[in-house]
Each structure stands twice: as structure tokens, then as C-alpha cells.
Amino acid sequence: MKTYINPNAEQWNELAERKTVATADLNETVKAVFNDIQKNGSKAVKKYTSYFDGVSIENFAVKSSEIENAVAQISSDLKNAIQVAADNISKFHNSQKEIPTKIETTSGVFCWRESRAIDTIGIYIPGGTAPLFSTVLMLAIPAKLAGCKNIILCSPPDKNGNINPAILYAAQLTGVTQMYKVGGIQAIAALTFGTDEIPKVSKIF
């Protein structure tokens, strides 16, 4: 990391610049990955995980032993902090639940509004240098309260092929039903089309 102290005014524009990505090139890459995964399933997902993340994954599904190991690595302080956050998020979203109200518009005719949960959803949790386990809480908790039966989590693996322990801890705490070690474009494509290892979902958050 470079540090600049009191840079000259002539440098301001250069220092404020951000790298840009050619949208057309990015779109073509995404289309190619999606088409490949739609056609070749998990084989293609493994190929792109190796290419983009630099790690070879044999089985994407997180095992129960991996979750147990992750839980053991989390400090009591962090567990308590996650629990407090989970309780607060639950309290907030519980207050948003609808109270069904039936209206008799004419004699014998009742009308009401009803919300129904999506059966199977996917949640994508960024990993890398700043694993956002808070995103697990903010996505999985309202999904669970809404009544989603299947909550599928995807998060990129590290160089050792593991998901960050805090993400796994938050996932098991909030009732995520399945967890997969896959990230990036390939994770979104896998959730979109489904593969022999990763289920297709109805909506991705």
C-alpha cells in the first residue's frame, strides 16, 4: 500500500482515479461462463474455481465436520457479538410480518392479501480478505422468518479450499440448509441453472 502525505494539487486528479473495467468485455466473460456451466455443470464450475480462485475443489458441499471445526475456531467474544446482531436483526424483521386482514367486500365475498415465501433461495456471501459474515445474518434471518424452506449459501473458498469459519458459524446459527464452497460468476451461474452438486434456486440474494 502506498501512502501519500500532503500531495501536491497537481497529483489530486491522478490519485482520485479508479480503475475501470470495459463493460463489453465483462459481459462477454459472464455470458461465456454462464453458457459453459449451463452446458457442463459442476465440471465447468470446478474449472472456473481453479481459474479465478486458484484452488482445486473436489466436492463443493460443506461437510458437517467442517462446520464443527469452524465453530471451534470462533472465539466466545465473536460468537456473542454475532448472537447479539442476530437477535437484533430477527427483532427488526419480525416486526415486518403481515397481520392477515380479511375484508368482506360484499355479502359472502372475502378478500385479503397473502404473502408466501419462496421455497428455495440462494444467498451469496463475499469472502476473501474481508469475509462478510454479517451478510449471512442480514440475508438468512429474514429468509428463515419468511418461511423459506431451503436456503442455499455459496461463498468463495480460500487457498486451502475452505470457507471462512465466521461465515460457516453464522450460517449454521441462522438455519442455512446447505453451504457450498464456490464463489464469483460460477457460483451465480450454478445457482441459476443447478448442477449435479449445487441445486437450482428460484431467487438469488
What are these regions (language model features)?
Residues E98-P100, R116-T120, A146-I151, T174-T177, ...:
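Short coil/turn connectors at secondary-structure junctions
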Residues G175-F205:
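Conserved NAD(P)+-binding/catalytic subdomain of aldehyde/semialdehyde dehydrogenases
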